[in-house]
Amino acid sequence: MPKLVIVESPAKAKTIGKYLGRGYKVTASMGHVRDLPASTLGIDVENGYTPKYITIKGKQKLVKELKAEAKKCDGVLLATDPDREGEAISWHLANILGLDPSAPNRVTFDEITKKGVKEGMAHPRAINIDLFNAQQARRELDRLVGYKLSPFLWKKVRRGLSAGRVQSVAVRLIRDRELEIENFKPDEYWNIDALLNPQGEKGEFTARLAATADGKKLTVTNKQQADGILAALDGRDYTITKIEKGKRRRQPSPPFITSTLQQDASRAFGFSATRTMRAAQTLYEGVDIAGHGTVGLITYMRTDSLRIAAEAQAAAKTFIAERWGDNYVCKTARKWKSRSATAAQDAHEAIRPSMPELPPDEVEQSISGDTAKLYRLIWSRFMASQMADCIQDTVSASITAGDYLFRASGFRVSFDGFTALYEESTDDAKKKETALPPLEEGQTLKLKKLTADQKFTQPPPLYTEATLIHALEENGIGRPSTYAPIITTIVDRGYVEKDQKKLKTTPLGQAVNTVMMEQFPDIVNVKFSADMEKKLDVVEAGQADWVKTIDDFYQGFEKSLEQAEKNMEGKRIKVEDIPTDEICEKCGRPMVIKSGRYGKFVACSGFPECRNAHPLVKDTGGLCPLDGGHMLVRKSAKGRVYYGCSNYPKCNYMTWDEPVPEKCPQCGSTLFKKKGQLYCAKEGCGFVKAIEKK
């Protein structure tokens, strides 16, 4: 009789089944099989917060099949993912199948390769009850907050609303940033730059005014001051008074953890956190690679550990030496400090290729799209982390002109090191530092141009998915498995919307945030939430009781809820409408954008006297190739975005391909984007060009 091995997904089952062979039957639970009921609280608060788990709707048949398979097999091994959620799935499966959770029937795989599966199968263990309790505590806390807060929001804001323990903090962070920008008062300053070049030499460069000649720092704050300095510099010689040379070593970034992978994929490819994790899950669970069969290409992707296995480091360094040469290999074992608060969180490695010797060029013959992009990113980042530093020769020049001191700096790369393979993407558009021409102390320079540019200090930018995830991580909010769901949830609930990658609160999100800030300050307090996460980590480490942790929170929360009911008795928060420049054709009043249960729509501001309304459509700025109408964003019945002409039904042109701002160089029509290329849809044009990779 074979042994039954249960994993979460069919893809994972297929890969593991290939390695285990005939003595095992591998099947999938399709994720969680039990949870708290959707229609009731499902927690006995008066009896030690005992959960009332039920089989998830639609999973009854699957559970029945798993029980039947278990009876036909010689034992069961639970091989769900190596994290809290995976441990919880295994605990529930053990409960359903009548397995002893303290028996060695739990196996985990940090990587789904022949070696990784063999290693996992060789070390079966009991279910980690502390890990399960941490998951159970998080689930109950989220249920208690959501189930108790939602009815309150229904009464005070709008029916159908809900609030979450962690999501509410994320909305607050986004709203705080918006208010910071709204209240920002810019300060004027001026940059005074001299375009110089050595007398009789080639190679001009720019130096910036930095101080007075005696070294006192100088800040130019208005035009009058700037004009005075320009006048004082008129006719002055520019002489190099000091040259400083040095060497600068740039170290590579550490391998990815969940948060940094999501941030980098967002910056590099515009991926949402959910899209990144979907592609990473595929790479972890296994894909068919020519010459290798079905193999998991990366280690487990939900981690905040920077630990790397010694054998993976060795394999990477061997490949680096063969590909780039021995001088490109880092000669020491780099160690990075993980943010992990507990040993339980540091159980995994960082995200790395399971086979460092398998470069993206070989893999991309078998995979494409998101998975190919993400594998190249993960492979490159990990390999770079095992490469030598980039070494730069730096030069800094101090230049005196009259009573003022200018400075210029630059560098030349003397050894490219890890940058031969990888450069980390960034959100900041930093000024690029370039090399200076050969310079000597005492040298007189020729002034080609002197400019004074007015500038103003800038507010911090709106959050993107990448920067919000960074802020959540920096503040200790959420954990690797929660970053993507947090963002998905606040967008799906209509509290936040994306506008050109920027995250903005909606009027509904602002109204809910106001209520939360005024009535439930602890729930949206960043430090309080971070402390709660730490307490749950302590539960995970087996150093605190999960029931007491929940009770300590719930006692205070219940009092806040009672007080909020008193504070807002008879009151209701109005969700502000968004004004438009559209006029109601029925009564002449302005039309406004309202938020309803099913999203935004345009309605007459004279409601309820005038009930004129229509769906909200977004204009892409592109024009229809058939009749010149506006190309609008629309959604299919299944929620898929497509683009259609504003003159529908007179014109029924529609496409799944996104219109872009760039115009056709041949006929001036709107271009559309499809699978790595831009094309013109105007009949008879036929223009097509590949999208350049950045």
Indicate residue ranges for each PLM-predicted region.
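Conserved short loop/turn motifs at secondary-structure junctions
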Residues: 1, 81-82, 158-162, 245-254, ...
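Basic, low-complexity terminal or inter-domain segments flanking catalytic cores
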Residues: 2-4, 15, 24, 150, ...
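C-terminal or mid-to-C-terminal helical accessory/interaction module adjacent to the motor/catalytic core
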Residues: 112-194, 245-246
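Short acidic, hydrophobic short linear motifs in intrinsically disordered regions
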Residues: 240-243, 252-265, 292-300, 459-471
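Alpha-helical scaffold elements adjacent to nucleotide-binding pockets in ATP/GTP-utilizing enzyme cores
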Residues: 15-19, 65, 88-96, 116-120, ...
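Metal- or metallocofactor-binding catalytic centers and their adjacent structured scaffolds
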Residues: 214-254, 443
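Intrinsically disordered, low-complexity regulatory segments
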Residues: 1-139, 220, 426
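Core structural elements
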Residues: 138-149, 166, 196-198, 248-260, ...
